[in-house]
Amino acid sequence: RDVLGSRGLGDVYKRQGLNTSTHLADSAFEVVKRNNRHNGTWTNPCGCERQQCFAAMEDETNGLLVANRGLYEYEVLADEENAIAVTLLRSVAEMGDWGYFPTPKAQQIGTFTLEFEVVPYAAGKTGEAFTEGYAFQQDLTAAQAGLSKAWLRKPGQVKPELVSGEMPLEMSFLRFEGEGIHLTAFKKGLAKDDLFVRFVNNMPQDEVLSFRKESWMKEVYRSNVVEEKGEVLCPDENGVYHVTLREFEIATFGVVK
């Protein structure tokens, strides 16, 4: 099977051979399920669909996700082993089927740099694949390590002695976990100093969100998009909050510092 193929200069596709009639695509606060073939009323020869962060397909044994950065158009080629074709560059000389409307600037003449990622995954790892697809949207952030106190006591030393090793998880600002649950917002309140965090459950079934009560948290409560205070949450004996999120639910929490 082809690892990667191309139908021309405009797109790239991955043949998969997965035995399924549907696929998944990231949308606004949801991962939608779509049919690989359009219904009989579809007459357009192009079967392109809209995606945001990724498109994926899976059967009972395997799955494959194609993440992208800014490549929002894809098409499933059902007659080519269910390949996912991602549009890399769309260049057109004219628009419209009711006349001739030249669009010379839309020919996209030049050099372009594009980014996408192919993520194979096993059955039962759908949530982890989604997490990788969302993580691909973010650049790594570098942070300078602190200086060794021993270096401060060495007179005349010019080159700093950097501290190495792993950052301790105990000092994390917010630790959470949940199959297919992702953080979508972290902000200070508009009318008060409380912090607000928002999660979405991208799975088609209920999932449990768990997050630890950090030392800086005085109180955690359910909230909404207008930052109203709702039910106050209580952690378990280990200092962990557990909240069940319904399928595709968007949940907002307020945190009192």
Put a short name on every predicted segment.
Residues 1, 6, 11-257:
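Terminal accessory/anchoring regions of large secretory-pathway or extracellular enzymes
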